[in-house]
Amino acid sequence: MQVDLLGSAQSAHALHLFHQHSPLVHCMTNDVVQTFTANTLLALGASPAMVIETEEASQFAAIASALLINVGTLTQPRAQAMRAAVEQAKSSQTPWTLDPVAVGALDYRRHFCHELLSFKPAAIRGNASEIMALAGIANGGRGVDTTDAAANAIPAAQTLARETGAIVVVTGEMDYVTDGHRIIGIHGGDPLMTKVVGTGCALSAVVAACCALPGDTLENVASACHWMKQAGERAVARSEGPGSFVPHFLDALWQLTQEVQA
């Protein structure tokens, strides 16, 4: 199994494209992370919109550049709105990304996520336990936290990618991104990033945005992981803990975009 590393030139090119296209991202995400997710997208140059009402979700999915479905705080009304948005996204050819939060721990969301897979997501982003559970290999995880190493989920990610046609992202100490054939590994980040709610969920929104960019979607999605890890490292170097990490992280994302435009 060959894992290729993402080059810095590829990442910089993708970030330039990101800022140039400024994707409009329809984020149907969980209640805990909405502000952080929106600010992450804004710092990178995207335009976030948090439209969740069923009557509006379908309409907005048709005009957005990309759609994110995050099941972190799933309810039946929210599932109805998400289903409507995904159906419209497929009809309108809007690329959509699934973040199957805690899919291995709870039956309702597992069944719902499996139902959504039939609408062919452009990308799926989760931790190792979530990806393995979604692929039907294991039902692990400790709530929203993983109990498996990212590398152990690569076979499940490849299977899921081949079955759905999605780019699958497994996040951890090292991130792995695959289309079922190629695998790209991304080093970096810091353990402190796991002590702040929303870093993974925000990454899923950035992944969704990257699916709307021209060029190699696998490399564009891998670049999203690289930007987040780079910004995390910079933020940790300047912060004293989780509380001061967040503003430094957003600043670091912004600075990355300024550097590729210089």
UniProtKB/Swiss-Prot annotation:
> What is the name of the protein in this document?
Hydroxyethylthiazole kinase
Native source organism of the sequence: Escherichia coli (strain K12)
* The protein's role, per its UniProt record: Catalyzes the phosphorylation of the hydroxyl group of 4-methyl-5-beta-hydroxyethylthiazole (THZ).
Homology family: Belongs to the Thz kinase family.
Gene name for this UniProt entry: thiM
List, alphabetically, the GO terms of the cellular component aspect: cytosol
The prosthetic group or cofactor this protein requires is: Mg(2+)
Q: Which Gene3D superfamilies match?
A: 3.40.1190.20
Give the EC number(s) under which this enzyme is classified: 2.7.1.50
Recorded GO molecular functions are: ATP binding; hydroxyethylthiazole kinase activity; identical protein binding; magnesium ion binding; prenol kinase activity
